[in-house]
Amino acid sequence: MKKKAIIILIIIIFVAIAIGTIIVKKSNNNVAQDGIQKIKMSEVTRSVFYAPQYVAINNGYFKDDGIEIELTTGQGADAVMTSVLSGESQIGFAGPEASIYVYNEGKEDYTQVFAQLTKRDGSFLVSKEKNDNFNWSNLKGKTVIPGRKGGVPYMTLEYVIKQKGLNSKTDLRLDDSIKFDLMASAFTSGTADYVTLFEPTASNIQKLGKGYIVASVGKEAGEIPYTAYFAKKSYIQNNEKMIQEFTNAIYKGQKWVKEHTAKEIAEAIQSFFPDTDLDLLTTAIQSYKDIDAWNETPVLKEESFNKLQDVISEAGELKQKAPYDKIVNNNYAYNACK
């Protein structure tokens, strides 16, 4: 009996060790054998608009701090947020409005924004007809494809339209039935007069002679925190070192982009746009330099955050404003800039 009890005890010990090993492996499943931490990040779309991010990846700024980015494209802020909340991705990259909505829903482990990349809308208004003397009043009686209703591209355009003295409901038609990734093809093959497109798509449409860039939505709307990085509050608290290193890499990318020419940036990020030639990529990047699209630091200012909420409120998509200090955690951005 004694021998049998010892055997049972030994079996129990081995089982406990095996379970413990599995738990440890699971908790470290994002850490490779070489010490590199793999981070799954979901970006809202693939665009030249996010050049500082791609520079940070290709220039090795993340790897310098022991981070390997596994990048996926969510095609929409909703999809990105779902990926983060489900744990499929650790970091999301989309508009801060997604975090505002989640907070207002009363979710306990809501997401916090810890670094800002772009500081204005990155879309350009593209016309079917060439118009060297475009005026926003030209939109009267026309059909525009602005993206999904409730999305920031839609709301920012609507904000500009109102600022220009037009009524978005009676003076023109905003066709919000087209999915974000189908807007360009719907415009070139359909009857809409205008569409809002990001680069390099906008410049490519113009190069093909299927449309003409007539205005920058972001230049007209002014500064708002258009795209930023966020993660669940609990994840940030439990991974402060990684979040700091991630933010440091983004800041290095922002500085590099500021200090280099459009062509140099195009050469640095071309691997992310294999179907776009270097000249077109350079043109697209210059468009963003011309409108001062990128934040110089990862810090998200309260003034621009409040303006974003004003834009959303005017569109009727925000029942109550969220507190800046709940949604935004600038600690890591400030540290990166030291």
Name each model feature, range by range:
Residues M1-K38, A336-K338:
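Short, low-complexity disordered leader/linker segments with a strong preference
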